[in-house]
Amino acid sequence: MTPAEALAYLHQLSQFGFQPGLDSTRRLAAAVGNPQERLRFIHVAGTNGKGSTCAFLESMYRAAGFRTGLYTSPHLVRFGERIQVGRQPLPEETLALLVSELRQRMPADLTPTFFEFTTVVALMAFAEAAVDVVLWETGLGGRLDATNIVTPLASVITSIGLDHMQVLGGTVGEIAAEKAGIIKPGVPILTSVDRADALAVIQYRARELDSHCVVVDAAAVSRMTWPVSLLGPHQRVNATLAVVTVRLLRAFFPVSDEHLTQGLAHTLWAGRMQVFQRGEQTWLLDGAHNADGVAAFRRALTDHFPDRHPVMVLGMLRDKAWREMATHLAPATSRLVVAPVSSPRTVQPEELREALQEARCGRAVRACASVEEALRAVTREPFVAVTGSLYFIGEVLERLGEIDPSGLVDSSAAGDDQRRLNEWTPATPR
């Protein structure tokens, strides 16, 4: 199987969408010898911040000399971003070998989803690489997420907000219950959740399972004074949660304070308050895609660029609270340029422009038919911010040909078929 054939096979699995439940993933893992049983995990869930928290954890452990595995989603440009060993994306040739092996061993009656199959490929890759610790991000929710077949050394819940409500529930409490599904008997749970109703759900579940619950609150964040590479007050919360987790697990992975500070100072996470220069232009890219994420982006923008109002390039998905997010972002801009996301779920630019005008946002809005047109429209602007969707961020990075500092973005390796693998759709009955 070639790399192109492996990606085509994975793309074909995306037709099965999201199928809640763990049976398929368990059967897939069993077919290749349950590689998860040879690995040690930190399992991270949350509405926002889980990827950043995983990135902080990975950076600190790598600074201390541990061999790390990092599993996150979605990818921005290249599939290998999802599965990393020592912060290096999975090579396409390795992906092809693992996909081929799993496909051959898969039970004939099984029709796994893209994410279920990818999750087991990640387990195979990490076991083969003999990593010391796996930073293991959930895909959607927690309780029924494919990643939940593991028993970790610690479970981590970053934040709880309203997102994916069509699957996880319509209230913060219901969503918290789904995220709390990653808590395992006797395994410590660490959380920076600050909503009282959500925190109560997590603490109740921890008591039920005799799991020690550590709450990282505002006081703990204020005591964490080490420099953090990622911008925004929300990233200081994520960094503090990661530090507390590393300290709790020092019996398994000794990490000195020197390595903690090195890791925090050198954490890279593309598309999350990512700043770079292109000639005279400053670019700021952030994948905020729900109300809480947009609020955090606004705060970070004000804190770090208090006297600057960027031209904002927006691309949004229809199954998000896009009207609310767009109108909340508008006051922070000098003007807006809106474009479609390469997804059937995109909000059309004219519809987004009309919604902003109806909301009397007080800013000029230009609707563009493509990402390329939107980027041409801002070529002379000194400060450009791009937000609204992680998928949109990936498209912009690809079009700009920008290699992000972590070396993860390789525009030559990207393509429409790879990007469509980011898509989430409800499962068809099977």
Role assignments for model-derived ranges:
Residues 38, 133-138, 145-156, 160-161, ...:
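Nucleotide phosphate-binding/pyrophosphate-handling subdomain across enzymes
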Residues 192-214, 218, 282-283, 291, ...:
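C-terminal helical cap/extension that packs against the catalytic core
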Residues 1-16:
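Charged, amphipathic alpha-helical linker segments immediately N-terminal to NTP-binding catalytic cores
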Residues 341-345, 407-430:
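Short, flexible loop segments at boundaries between secondary-structure elements
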Residues 140-146, 151-210, 322:
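Conserved catalytic-core segment of NTP-binding enzymes
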Residues 44, 52-69:
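A conserved segment at the C-terminal end of the G1
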Residues 373-401:
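A glycine-rich beta-strand to alpha-helix segment
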